[in-house]
Amino acid sequence: MRMSEYFRILQGLPDGSFTREQAEAVAAQYRNVFIEDDQGTHFRLVVRQDGTLIWRSWNFEDCAGYWMNQYIRDFGILK
């Protein structure tokens, strides 16, 4: 691992609801975090492990970002 990779600062989500831009920035950092159920103004951000759903949150839910950050920290696979 190069030092630049080791010290890379990852973008997380705010503790509450989050925007599409924030979700896209986070999903772009991980191989197993995706935007699904896209209905335009609202969508789900999901974490999967070997195709199995680990956690999902609608972008407008209270505390959505807080819980998503916890599951990404524990299960996220960096690109």
Swiss-Prot record:
Keywords: Plasmid
SUPFAM superfamilies registered for this protein in UniProt: YcfA/nrd intein domain
Acyltransferase found in the keyword field: no
Disulfide pairings: none
Family: Belongs to the UPF0401 family.
Protein name as it appears in the record: UPF0401 protein YubL
Native organism: Salmonella choleraesuis (strain SC-B67)
